[in-house]
Amino acid sequence: DVLPDSIDWREKGAVVPVKNQGGCGSCWAFDAIAAVEGINQIVTGDLISLSEQQLVDCSTRNHGCEGGWPYRAFQYIINNGGINSEEHYPYTGTNGTCDTKENAHVVSIDSYRNVPSNDEKSLQKAVANQPVSVTMDAAGRDFQLYRNGIFTGSCNISANHYRTVGGRETENDKDYWTVKNSWGKNWGESGYIRVERNIAESSGKCGIAISPSYPIKEXXX
């Protein structure tokens, strides 16, 4: 397969502005929602900010502010028939009761797929088509204090933070992933981090290639 030399889904209008999860451990919801916002824009042309809070409150196979998994968020959206907009089910940053009155199916997806583990080439193929959910180790000081540039600092390969890969490019012969975080716009490069790509470890930098997944949305005939 011929892959584009670089891709940045922000430039293609498939990424809403960076959000902030606050003190709630809901990165899994922000990660899943960013991927759904992306594929919805790619398929329909509409960029709609969707509700992380609905996932926190209603995705019972996840644990709200105590953590969760993007693939289970995708399962919830599929089983629920869709997800509401952020406007109508806004983020509070706390565990709430599922508000069934605010269950408008603003955006739906058809299924989801896991990218083969520990294979940056497969992740590259997936990101060529849409933003992809990944897990990374964000517990380290280097990561938390990241300001700018291509991140080459120390980190483990444990899965403790989810975020969304929105592109891949090369600068001065260094390959990197463009990763959207959910710690607000003041962190990193306006809320993003560039992470070195094609490294020796198959798990990728900070474990980025361990368990990527993405939602699937068919174009309505």
UniProtKB/Swiss-Prot annotation:
Enzyme class: hydrolase
Catalytic residues (positions): 27, 161, 181
Known catalytic reactions: Preferential cleavage of peptides with a proline residue at the P2 position
Alphabetical list of Gene3D superfamilies matching this protein: Cysteine proteinases (3.90.70.10)
GO biological processes: proteolysis
TM regions (residue ranges): none
Gene Ontology MF term list: cysteine-type peptidase activity
UniProt keyword annotations, A-Z: Disulfide bond, Glycoprotein, Hydrolase, Protease, Thiol protease
Annotated disulfide bonds: 24-65, 58-98, 155-206
InterPro entries assigned to the protein according to its UniProt record, in alphabetical order: Papain-like_cys_pep_sf (IPR038765), Pept_asp_AS (IPR025661), Peptidase_C1A (IPR013128), Peptidase_C1A_C (IPR000668), Peptidase_C1A_papain-like (IPR039417)
EC number: 3.4.22.67
PANTHER family reported for this sequence: CYSTEINE PROTEASE FAMILY C1-RELATED
Protein function: Cysteine proteinase with a high level of diversity in substrate specificity, an amino acid bearing a proline residue at the P2 position is preferred.
Homology family: Belongs to the peptidase C1 family.
Protein name in the entry: Zingipain-1
